[in-house]
Structures are given as structure tokens and as C-alpha cells.
Amino acid sequence: HAYHLQQAVERSEARAAVVVLSSNFVQRGEPALQDKWSRAETALRCGADLVLELPVPFSCHNAGVFAKGAVGILASTGVVTHLSFGMEGEIPEMDAILDILLHEPLPFKEKLKSVLALGMSYVEARANAIDALLQGVKDALSTPNNNLALAYLLEVRKRRAPLEITPVIR
């Protein structure tokens, strides 16, 4: 995370870095390895200027809800101009993917419904449904970092949040 913070500040030319961290509980309701105070202190030592807590109802949920909370917090400050997150690699089709998820065309809905009926997880089924429309993107949508990146981008678009996107490739 220190590398990510350094890269985000460098790429955005930010004068200050605001970090949103999960509470004491993380995805699936599991306790964090370190308490929120220790993690906030570490973030400050690594260069963050302000650390804000992502409340438990967001931090324990899926990527979409997690992103909704984080983007909401950052956008509501009125001072944050950039959003940085990690990705596993560039996804050239990202705008087309976001358009599909925002507008949910009928072929997407039908494919999603059919693959969910096979017992796939929602994330896997969504990747398959998008891949049916934009062949070759399923693998890129199957990694946790890219899934969260997609959730952040989708939330920024839904809110029309004035945040410039600064991804860091891991």
C-alpha cells in the first residue's frame, strides 16, 4: 500500500493524500488483521495526510457497496480531486464495460440470468455476460483488484462525481 500511495500522489501531483480505510471489519465480516487505529497510523507514516474510515456496513459488503461508500465519502469532502485504486492491468474495453453495466441492455440481462441459473456467483456470472457482448474480457474481470476497480468506476459514473481517475497497475 505504501507503493500505491506514493504512485497515486506522484501521478496526480496531489498536494495532500486522503485515504479511506476499512473499519475493524473487512469483506465478508472478517476482522481486520490490525485494528483501524494501527492501520490509520501506518497510512499516515506512509504519507497520507488524512485517513477516513469506511463504515462497517460498506467495508463488510461486496465490491459495489464498498465502492459506493468510499466514493461517497471522498466526493462529499469537496476537496478530493482524484481517485486512485489498484488494477491488475489495463482494460482497453473499460468504457464499453461501464456502458453495459450502466444501461444493462437486454442481451446482457438475458445472459446474466441464464448463467446465474447455472449456479455461478454474481461476479462470475456478470463477467460471463459482459464477455458474451465484448469477447475476451472475462479474464480481466475475474481478478479481485479489477472487480473493485470496475466498482469504483461505475460508482463515479453513477454519481457523476468530479473525480479524476488515477489507477495504479500492480
Pin down the residues of each PLM region.
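Acidic, Ser/Thr-rich peripheral helices and adjacent loops at domain boundaries
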Residues: 38-41, 106-107
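Non-catalytic positions within long, well-ordered alpha-helices that form the structural scaffold/packing
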Residues: 9-10, 44, 71, 75-76
